[in-house]
């Protein structure tokens, strides 16, 4: 077989096994672990290339014969479950149909089952791109619908959260309370080009108010201190969640009015729960809520304002807290409440615990102390800062950072999918799942996606002047694409609900046109099910200094003065 140099091959078909890719301007390098395509018969679109009639594209088989709708050729996949691999990705009926070698089995060897390219197939050239699952943000305050556009512009295509717009309750808590509000929000999100699951109010001792929200369509209960995060409220929310198989998320009691962190852990009664603000800067038992991350039944997340820990993190938190939680700077008790959350020691420990795989998920807390359009960016910045502070992870190979990168990718893809009961639909690049995918230029990985594929259609992309002679001339903006338009939006986006709501006919009763899918397996999971982030060490917090020890070792880092992928990526 004729041979070419590795450099020439990479120029034609992109990197292959053993090649390394730098991510943005970080010091993070991934290495392709395996290539599923084979060499010599690569599928390539374009003039004089292989995906032409009778060559790589079959000219006899119809779509009814299983031909792909879309193929992404020669792309580098970065996925928490698959690893870092090179492959073609086939899409059909809005789902991932195959990962491997695409083409025409009539003239090509080794074409993967279900990955035939034909007349019905369009192509995206992935030769010099990275493909990930689209991000999932599990901590959304539904304050403004425009959040969806900013999230898509950073590669996030699924929201879990609550609210009804800019009410004070929504500004402070991720809650859509009661059946009427839930119904209206289900109808409103029909026009959003992202998947959405709504959280109801879990602060109730009564069974009735909890059950009616599950039947109305929520995918979980949120117990928030602003509504009273008492032990009894937690117990009742968890019991009802067990009954209807939905998740419970908690923002615990910062003031320790109703008990301490030990009392809250006791109220969990060993049942599965998603803890928001596990670090405590965004709220929760002061100063030691971070201890819950050691519990096997706790699925811990934290939010992006303190990730990575920077020299300005502490200063900006105070004003955030005052605004979000309706506090008065002229009331000493309100000021003390805000100040109790701002603890540099626990913020530093939060960063370290993410790097160790102890805090398992990463979310935004959109417009309520966090930035909805910065999740992927903050994840890569944090991973890079932790490599600089802590060195290579023991799990990483000598020449790459694959494990660390995949650990952080899991925090915004598969782990929130598992936690919210939707990993059978989204969260990873796996055959059979909805084709919610993001393509990145490696130079902008984590900062600026090239395009977002939603349910098999491109619904968001960096696009040049629509009046230009090419797609590329400036000004290049993120713009909605055809997948986010008309009735296709409903076909390519999902509204997640409880099984109780689906059984009650919520789709018909609320007049929903989108796909409506029930969450499942929310109550039988534990931290052991979370990918690459399942560690449960002993965590202690000094009540005087707030120093955090993990298995007896002080967990801390210095705040960074500069971050990767920062000002040089964002002018203005």
Swiss-Prot record:
Domain Urease: 134-572
Catalytic activity reported: urea + 2 H2O + H(+) = hydrogencarbonate + 2 NH4(+)
Mod. after translation: Carboxylation allows a single lysine to coordinate two nickel ions.
InterPro entries in UniProt: Amidohydro-rel, Metal-dep_hydrolase_composite, Metal_Hydrolase, Urease_alpha_N_dom, Urease_alpha_subunit, Urease_AS, Urease_asu, Urease_asu_c
Keyword Zinc on entry: no
UniProt remark on cofactor binding: Binds 2 nickel ions per subunit.
Name of the protein in its database record: Urease subunit alpha
């Amino acid at each position: 077989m004729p041979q070419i140099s590795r450099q020439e091959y990479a120029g034609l078909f992109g990197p292959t096994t053993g090649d390394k890719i730098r991510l943005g301007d970080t010091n993070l390098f991934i290495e392709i672990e395996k290539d599923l395509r084979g060499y010599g018969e690569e599928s390539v679109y374009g003039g004089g290339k292989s995906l032409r009639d009778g060559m790589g594209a079959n000219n006899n088989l119809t779509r009814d014969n299983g031909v792909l709708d879309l193929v992404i050729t020669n792309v580098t996949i970065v996925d928490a479950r698959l690893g870092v691999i090179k492959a073609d990705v086939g899409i059909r009926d809005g789902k991932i149909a195959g990962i491997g070698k695409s083409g025409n089995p009539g003239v090509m060897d080794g074409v993967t089952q279900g990955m035939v390219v034909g007349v019905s197939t369009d192509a995206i050239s992935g030769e010099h791109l990275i493909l990930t699952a689209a991000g999932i943000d599990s901590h959304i305050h539904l304050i403004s619908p425009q959040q969806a556009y900013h999230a898509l512009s950073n590669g996030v295509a699924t929201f879990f959260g609550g609210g009804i717009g800019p009410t004070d309750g929504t500004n402070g808590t991720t809650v859509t309370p009661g059946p009427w509000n839930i119904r209206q929000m289900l109808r409103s999100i029909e026009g959003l080009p992202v998947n959405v699951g709504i959280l109801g109010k879990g602060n109730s001792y009564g069974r009735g108010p909890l059950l009616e929200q599950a039947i109305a369509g929520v995918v979980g209960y949120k117990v928030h201190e602003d509504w009273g995060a008492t032990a009894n409220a937690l117990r009742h929310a968890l019991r009802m969640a067990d009954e209807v198989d939905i998740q419970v998320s908690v923002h615990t009691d910062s003031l320790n009015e109703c008990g301490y962190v030990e009392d809250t852990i006791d109220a969990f009664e060993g049942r599965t729960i998603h803890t928001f603000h596990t670090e405590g800067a965004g709220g929760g038992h002061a100063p030691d809520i971070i201890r819950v991350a050691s519990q096997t039944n706790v699925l811990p997340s934290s939010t992006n304002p303190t990730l990575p820990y920077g020299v300005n993190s502490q200063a900006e938190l105070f004003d955030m807290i005052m605004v979000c939680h309706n506090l008065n700077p002229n009331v000493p008790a309100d000021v003390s409440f805000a100040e109790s959350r701002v603890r540099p020691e626990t913020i530093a420990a939060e960063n370290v615990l993410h790097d160790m795989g102890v805090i398992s998920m990463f979310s935004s807390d959109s417009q309520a102390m966090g930035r909805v359009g910065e999740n992927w960016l903050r994840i890569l910045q944090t991973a890079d800062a932790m490599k600089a502070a802590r060195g290579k992870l023991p799990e990483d190979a000598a020449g790459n950072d694959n494990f660390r990168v995949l650990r952080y990718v899991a925090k915004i893809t598969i782990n929130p999918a598992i936690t919210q009961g939707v990993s059978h639909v989204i969260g990873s690049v796996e055959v059979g799942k909805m084709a919610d995918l993001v393509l990145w230029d490696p130079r902008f990985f984590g900062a600026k996606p090239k395009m977002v594929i939603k349910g098999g259609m491109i619904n968001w992309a960096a696009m040049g002047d629509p009046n230009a002679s090419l797609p590329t001339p400036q000004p290049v903006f993120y713009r909605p694409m055809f997948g986010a338009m008309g009735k296709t939006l409903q076909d390519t986006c999902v509204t997640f609900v409880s099984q109780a709501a689906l059984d009650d006919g919520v789709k018909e009763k609320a007049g929903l046109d989108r796909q409506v899918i029930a969450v499942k397996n929310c109550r039988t999971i534990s931290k052991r099910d979370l990918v690459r982030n399942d560690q449960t060490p002993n965590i202690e917090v000094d009540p005087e200094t707030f120093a955090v020890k993990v298995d007896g070792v002080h967990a801390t880092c210095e705040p960074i003065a500069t971050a990767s992928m920062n000002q040089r990526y964002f002018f203005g």
